UniProtKB/Swiss-Prot annotation:
Family designation: Belongs to the heat shock protein 70 family.
Induction info: By stress conditions e.g. heat shock.
Organism: Colwellia psychrerythraea (strain 34H / ATCC BAA-681)
Phylogenetic lineage: Bacteria, Pseudomonadati, Pseudomonadota, Gammaproteobacteria, Alteromonadales
Protein name in UniProt: Chaperone protein DnaK 1
Encoding gene per record: dnaK1
Taxonomic superkingdom: Bacteria
Renumbered residue ranges of the record's region Disordered: 595-633
Amino acid sequence: MTKIIGIDLGTTNSCVAVMEGGIAKIIENAEGSRTTPSIVAYANNETLAGQPAKRQSVTNSTNTLFAIKRLIGRKFDDKEVQKDIKLAPYKIVKADNGDAWVEVDGKALSPQEVSAQILRKLKKDAEAYLGETVTDAVITVPAYFNDSQRQATKDAGKIAGLNVKRIINEPTAAALAYGVDKNSNADQKVVVYDLGGGTFDLSIIEISNVDGEKQFEVLATNGDTFLGGEDFDLRLINYLADEFKKESGIDIHQDTLALQRIKEAAEKAKIELSSALQTEVNLPYVTADASGPKHLNVKVTRAKLESLVDDLVKSTIAPCEQALKDAGLSKADVSEVILVGGQTRMPKVQEAVKTFFSKEPRKDVNPDEAVAMGAAIQAGVMSGAVDDVLLLDVAPLSLGIETLGGVMTKLIEKNTTIPTRASETFSTAEDNQAAVTVHVLQGQREMATDNKSLGQFNLTDINPGPRGSVQVEVTFDIDVNGILNVSAKDKATGKEQSIKITASSGLTEDEINRMVKEAELHASEDKQKRELVDQRNQADQLIHTVQTSMTSLAQDQQTELKTLIEQLKMAVNGSDKAAIEMRQSALQEAYSKTMQTEQAQSQQAAQHQGNAANDGAKDEDIIDADFEDVSNG
């Protein structure tokens, strides 16, 4: 059976893993790292994903897309998107369907398309490691992701050429990676404290023993989608810039190249201060003014960094309190606290978590890799490689329809274990009503207008009758991925209408297919570019070989080869692979013939010398003997 990979599609970094020999193994990317920056850049008609995109992020900020996960499956008018518009250096625009898209070089791109670039890179890295084509994946999402965001994540997978077998919640995946389900047969309440690069997610999970198998249920979620390690970096960047300004009088924020260097140095210093008490940020020639080059040299202590980010760490505690309250639990009810996300390596963060929960948090799994490992374990469950886990997630928000008076009537309550199905019968609101509009909603508020609209459809041609006499059965059906299907049926006639909730916020099937084709086209272009580079490299190697070895050749032979070399160099400077191949073949053929001729002449000369030597040797073999005449005559 082909492998199913597990993917953590993160806001700041992403990660891919696979089950091997019953163990979840993280797959390194082409750059040799175990995590890949969730960054996509568009530069010089080329699309960069991961570390190459990150390296040029400051100098090409308007065309470098990061934290795109904050936009996926969201409407442009959402308050979270409006906040992002003020912070993001790239342009966020309103799509025709009201979704939040981004614009690069005048072209509108959906977050699904951009996320697909990251997924495609992870897919490619997995294929390089496994030595086989990968088509199936399990992808994780935050527990609070609504139906639109989950569907959009699946669409991103499809555009990347992946069949998304399952969408699972990140905290559930982390709990699987930590093996919390193996610790005890008793029911457990586990807190997952996930402070990543761009978001903070706090989840409380209940792990129950159901007929010898473990059931995972998310009891509560909370957090801040605009708080993460990047905010910690920013505090240190601003501190370094302020110190530099005090020293030199130069505002480094105006120099994008210098700012890129400071950004990288700040991130490195922050990481170092998780294990060291002091570090030094030393950037020679960081910028210059009329008086000459300037150098940045600042000592930073752990205590200083902690004072800079103290309020950020404290701000993670309120969501912990709220989640406990929502779950109806006290701190004493918590069995374990597990840490996820790179920022949880910071000692001050660990101390804050320990102080609040009065419990030492678990940190025995790499926090950057835990979610991807959990996704790989779930992939193993689906492929049959793992057989002792039963994974049951829950609906993150209540689902229902709009009824008389603009009220939301809930059919599926928040935190209901999925997959699930619920039906309820409604009656017509007016006499002789010939059609019923079913308006599907998601949220916790009482009034329809205060909740998120997921879509609507009409059940037409129902039998007219007095108000309340026509019975319409509405059924909500959520699959294991949290994707919702809604149907309405006239009980008298059996006439039925249904909708798969995708169109309200997301891409149409035609749009997805177009993006898949574009992705395939880019894959083809990428392949052609790579083949062109390989051809150029081969040509350069041949040129070097010929130039090195032709110095001993006759002048006329050298002249012919030099002409062919110049022709090949001209072809290499162009972009026509066929032309390079043709010129390379011509040079190779001429060089081979010349070398064969040279070799034949060398052999003849050697043979001639050998023959002459042999003749000389024969003469030398004749021994002049002295004969003594012994005859008596």
